[in-house]
Amino acid sequence: MDGLIIPDLPPEEAKNLRQAAGRFNIVTIFFCAPTSTDERIRANTKASRGFVYYVSLTGITGTQKALAPSVVKQINHIKHFTQKPVCAGFGISTPQQVRDIGSAADGVIVGSAIVKAIYQNRASRDLVGNVSRYVSSLVKALR
């Protein structure tokens, strides 16, 4: 394990965790959200090690049909506060979304959509192949 991402844990409440993680060379990664103030962005980018995680939508993770037009603008705004990579995730599931986010973010995080692809292919003899082709379509969107 290289890092910890703990939702809903702000840096000011994570002092002991950050110290313990640091002793084992484990990075702590904090979130910035569409609702984050500049003060919160400043605190979270300063406290993050490894990268900053931008939550590309409000609400819970999963898939969404379209990204808010402000996502790229917000990622660029966060980059004014840090030299660390800014990666974005939550609700990303299509090659077009990966392409759009990838135009600004240093990394694109896809989680729930891959879990969904595994679930949808759970009875298939080619589960690994089907999921691999899906993931490859996302990766290809970045090239």
Feature-to-residue mapping (PLM):
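Glycine-enriched alpha-helix->loop->beta-strand junction motifs that scaffold or abut catalytic
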Residues: 1-3, 20-29, 47-54, 104-107
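Glycine-rich phosphate-binding active-site loops on the catalytic face of alpha/beta enzymes
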Residues: 3-5, 10, 54-62, 91, ...
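Active-site-adjacent beta->alpha loops and helix N-cap segments on the catalytic face
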Residues: 5-23, 37-42, 61-76, 95-98, ...
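Surface-exposed amphipathic alpha-helices with a cationic face
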Residues: 18-22, 72-82, 135-143
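Short beta-strand/loop segments at the ligand-binding rim of alpha/beta enzyme cores
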Residues: 21-31, 79-89
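Short, basic, helix/turn surface patches
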Residues: 27-42, 55-65, 81, 136-143
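Catalytic cores of alpha/beta
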Residues: 36-46, 88, 92-108
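C-terminal helical cap(s) of enzyme catalytic domains, especially alpha/beta-barrels
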Residues: 115-143
